């Protein structure tokens, strides 16, 4: 892609990097003025990522592998860093991995945020991150054959059903705290679950000393499906269905990645419509979580009232695109449908109604003593940079829509609740502004041509955090590689640190405060480190104990 060098961001960072590590950068390729990919010597990969991460305020939202043997004879690993300092940009660090040895130096000992991504690369490609501290599988089940790696480009017979390699679960859960702690397994299955997950809490009496968890029980293989069976625009509708709550955010991130790779200029009206639907999605997600927060502290009147108001956001979505879920609107280059005058006026009416309703509910919520008592000081996550991609890397129409960045310094469950409250009101204000200031342009850019093996990032600040997609185009009207990283993927690894030092009754509140995409898991096994005993109890008992704090299931 041709990029005007005068507007390129990150040049000073790259110059400093080349001075620090002479000869480390083998190649440099611009995707957009804000995005650049550098290929580095593989032995210097940890040094380069560590330098960008710690010395230039880097953030590591996603890393992934790619089977590029048909392109250059190698595998490749990519570490995408969002630079959060004075010069905000994206720097993707790439290293080529020998196809025979399949080894590359692990970055995790230098940057712990890389651990899940490197475990996934090992599972899906069979690459070996040398020095990776956590050697457990991440995605593949215990009975998966050692020599089968789903995302390789090798010919695979999808009718093949390999024999299980083991009849029992062999996954070792890790307790970094008191080795004698009681263990509480939570999950992995529940009849109402949308996605299973297995939690294990290590407790000493009522106190959680550590936690571990295993997910990916229902890995859907969406990335492989997109690469093998779907065209570019068909993947747009697949990305809608990555998540039941923030599907539109994923759809925007995917289309944005392809548009960035090809240099497609999306019409301004399409950008505005995308922003409107993203804020509608944020509304119904935040209202859902606020309702659940009420439930977890025993305030079920608030739970029902927040869900009542949430229905209006679903009605808003149906009014704008014909569906209560924000599906089917995006295309590469723009959107499929316009927002007409009557729809706009009815939506503005709903915005005014919702503002009054939410104001009343928040006043009632904050007047409930149990809310602050139960949520303040628990589930603390150390304060870091206040990040929001709508501000740090504006996309869609967020560079033009007035908005406010809300921060609370507690880092606890109460702070996360209050951020959602403030963002709910801000989303309503953003909707009013966008609906009143829609530009008069076309909806879709057409007539562009696809360029094989062009690639770029796309990103969205979803209600739970950032969704980051990376797309490399193929030469057969299909994607060569699609990496789809949901917000919760980055939220899970920090959960164990948020649970430590809190009580079992706090666990549902802490987990729920992340608003994770996971199931209502069924059972919890308690392992007492002192008595060296384990006990399995239904998760509903843990949830009930968190609400009324009577009749401890640990006794």
UniProtKB/Swiss-Prot annotation:
One cellular-component annotation, GO: formate dehydrogenase complex
Gene3D superfamilies with a match to the protein in the record: Cytochrome-c3 Hydrogenase, chain B, NADH:ubiquinone oxidoreductase, 30kDa subunit
Molecular function in Gene Ontology: 4 iron, 4 sulfur cluster binding; metal cluster binding; NAD binding; NADH dehydrogenase (ubiquinone) activity; nickel cation binding; quinone binding
Residue stretches in coiled coil: none
Pfam families documented for this protein: Complex1_30kDa (PF00329), Complex1_49kDa (PF00346), NiFeSe_Hases (PF00374)
Enzyme Commission number, as recorded: 1.-.-.-
Cofactor binding, note field: Binds 1 [4Fe-4S] cluster.
Keywords on record: 4Fe-4S, Iron, Iron-sulfur, Metal-binding, NAD, Oxidoreductase
Keyword check for Protein biosynthesis: no
Highest taxon of the lineage: Bacteria
Cofactor(s) required, per the database record: [4Fe-4S] cluster
BP term (GO), one: glucose catabolic process
Function: Possible component of hydrogenase 4.
Family to which the UniProt record says this protein belongs: Belongs to the complex I 49 kDa subunit family.
Identification of the protein by name: Hydrogenase-4 component G
